A protein has these predicted regions:
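Non-ligating segments of multi-cofactor redox enzymes
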Residues: 1-451
Length: 451
C-alpha cells in the first residue's frame, strides 16, 4: 500500500527562483539591521557575503594585497565560466529586489534599449579605469555597497536617491535594466559569461513563437539564435514557457561551430568605444579624486587620506554600527572625491573607540588598528577661550571626559593635553561647556597611526 502513495516532488523551479533571491535580500537587510551596540558575531556573515563580488577583490589587488578570502570571488568567477551569471540570477541581494519588482510589475523590454548594448563594455572599462586610478566610486555602484548605503540612508531618515532611481528604471523601462546595463558587477560577470561552458539552447523544432524572448528578464533569449546570450541569469523561464520542448544546456565546445562561436568576440566599434572610455576616465579621474575640503576627522583606523578615498566604497556600514552615531556621510559640498565618505564632527558626538567600524568595513579603508596606535587627530586648547586658562575658573570637564587620560592639570585649574596619549576621539571637544567653537578642538593629523 505504501508504494501506491504518490512520491514527494520537489517544488518547481519558479518556487526556488523566487525564494533564493528573496532570501538573499532578506538576509542582507536583517544582518544590516543588527549593526548596533553590542555588535553580534553573526553579523560578520554580511562581510563574507560581500566578498563574493569580484570587484572587491580587484580593489584589494589594486592596492597590492592578496586577501585570504581570495577563493570566494574566484569561486563565483568559476561558476560564471561554467554556467553564466549565477550570482546575478540567484545570489545578488539587489537582484533579488529587482526580481521581486519584476514579479509585481513585469514589463517587456523596449526595442530602443538594444541601442545601449554597444556602450556596456565601454561603461565597465570606464569604471574599472577609475578604480585603477584610485577612485572609490566604482565599488559604490556594486550591488552590496549600493544596497547597504541606501538602506543606511533610510535608517538615517534620508532619501535613498540612487535606490529609488534603480527601482524607477525597473518600473519605467524593465525590471533588470540596472543589472544588464549599469551594474559594474553584473557587467563584469556578463563579460566572463561570454566564455561560459554551458549554454541554454532552444529545442529542436523551435516554432519561433517568441514566448522565451518575451518572458526573459534580461533579453538573453533569442529564438532566432542558436543559444542564449551572456546575459542569461539561468532563471529557467524560457524552459517553462516553451510549448515545444525544454531548453537544453549544452557544452558549447561539443563540436557545433555555431555554438562554439557564441558571443565571445568584440567588434571594432566596441574596441574604439572602449578606448574612448579609457581616455574619458583618464580625464575624469583627477576631478573625482582631488579632495576639495580640508583634511577631515576620520573614524579610528582610517588609512591615510589618499588611500582611504581610493578604498572607501561609501557603503555606510561604519555609520550604521557606530554606537554614538558620531560617524556621518560628508556632504555634497565637500566635492566628488569626499562626498558620502565617513567623517566625524567631534563637537556633535564623540567616538567611543569601540572599533566596530573596523570590524564591518568591507574594503579595508578603515583598517584594524589598536587604540594605542590610533591617531584620529590631536586635541588643542585655545587658552583665550578656555575657562581655566583665561578666567582661572575650575572646569576640567575635558579632563573628566577623556577616556585615554590624555589631559592633565598640574595646578588643578588649567588643562594640558598629553600628545602621546591623545587619539583624537573628540570626547573633550564634545563635552566642553564653551559655546561653539569649543575651547578645546580636535585637529586632524596628516598621519593617522602612531609608529
Amino acid at each position: 500500500m505504501l508504494l501506491d502513495k504518490p512520491m514527494y516532488k520537489l517544488p518547481p523551479l519558479c518556487f526556488w527562483r523566487t525564494l533564493i533571491p528573496a532570501l538573499a535580500l532578506l538576509i542582507t537587510i536583517s544582518l544590516l539591521s543588527k549593526f548596533n551596540y553590542p555588535l553580534p558575531d553573526y553579523t560578520s556573515i554580511l562581510l563574507w557575503y560581500s566578498r563574493l563580488d569580484p570587484l572587491l577583490l580587484l580593489s584589494f589587488l589594486r592596492n597590492g594585497e592578496i586577501p585570504g578570502w581570495l577563493w570566494l570571488p574566484l569561486a563565483m568567477l568559476l561558476a560564471t565560466l561554467l554556467a553564466g551569471r549565477v550570482f546575478c540570477g540567484w545570489l545578488c541581494p539587489l537582484g533579488g529586489l529587482l526580481a521581486l519588482l519584476g514579479s509585481v510589475r513585469s514589463r517587456p523590454i523596449p526595442a530602443w534599449v538594444d541601442r545601449l548594448k554597444p556602450f556596456r563594455v565601454p561603461w565597465l572599462l570606464f569604471l574599472l579605469a577609475l578604480m585603477a586610478w584610485g577612485s572609490g566610486w566604482t565599488l559604490y555602484l556594486s550591488p552590496f555597497h549600493l544596497l547597504t548605503e541606501e538602506l543606511n540612508r533610510i535608517w538615517l531618515g534620508q532619501i535613498p536617491w540612487l535606490l529609488l532611481a534603480v527601482v524607477f528604471s525597473g518600473l519605467v523601462i524593465f525590471p533588470r535594466f540596472w543589472c544588464v546595463y549599469l551594474c559594474p558587477t553584473g557587467l563584469l560577470f556578463s563579460i566572463v559569461s561570454r566564455w561560459r561552458l554551458l549554454r541554454a539552447k532552444p529545442p529542436q523544432g523551435c516554432i519561433h513563437c517568441g514566448r522565451c524572448e518575451k518572458i526573459c528578464p534580461t533579453g538573453a533569449a533569442d529564438p532566432a539564435a542558436s543559444q542564449t546570450t551572456a546575459d542569461c541569469l539561468l532563471c529557467g523561464r524560457c524552459s517553462e514557457k516553451c510549448p515545444v520542448d525544454l531548453f537544453d544546456f549544452v557544452n558549447h565546445r561539443s563540436g557545433n561551430p555555431a555554438l562554439a562561436a557564441g558571443d565571445v568576440g568584440f567588434t571594432r566599434r566596441e574596441v574604439l568605444r572602449s578606448g574612448t572610455a579609457l581616455l574619458v576616465a583618464g580625464a575624469a579621474a583627477p576631478l573625482l579624486m582631488k579632495p576639495t575640503a580640508a583634511n577631515p576627522l576620520r573614524p579610528p583606523g582610517a588609512l591615510e587620506e589618499a588611500e582611504f578615498l581610493s578604498r572607501c566604497s561609501r557603503c555606510g556600514r561604519c555609520m550604521r554600527v557606530c554606537p554614538s552615531k558620531c560617524i556621518r556621510p560628508m556632504p555634497f559640498s565637500s566635492g566628488p572625491a569626499m562626498f558620502l565618505t565617513p567623517y566625524i564632527i567631534a563637537r556633535d558626538a564623540r567616538c567611543e573607540l569601540t572599533q566596530y567600524c573596523q570590524q564591518v568595513c568591507p574594503t579595508g579603508a578603515i583598517g584594524h588598528l589598536p587604540v594605542e596606535k590610533t591617531l584620529m587627530g590631536l586635541a588643542e586648547i585655545d587658552h583665550s577661550r578656555c575657562l581655566g586658562w583665561s578666567q582661572g575658573k575650575l572646569c576640567l570637564l575635558c579632563q573628566e571626559q577623556c577616556p585615554r587620560h590624555a589631559i592633565e592639570s598640574p595646578d588643578k585649574i588649567r588643562p594640558q593635553v598629553i600628545a602621546d596619549l591623545c587619539v583624537g576621539c573628540g570626547a573633550c571637544e564634545n563635552g566642553c561647556p564653551v559655546d561653539s567653537p569649543a575651547a578645546i578642538v580636535v585637529k586632524p593629523q596628516p598621519s593617522r597611526s602612531r609608529k
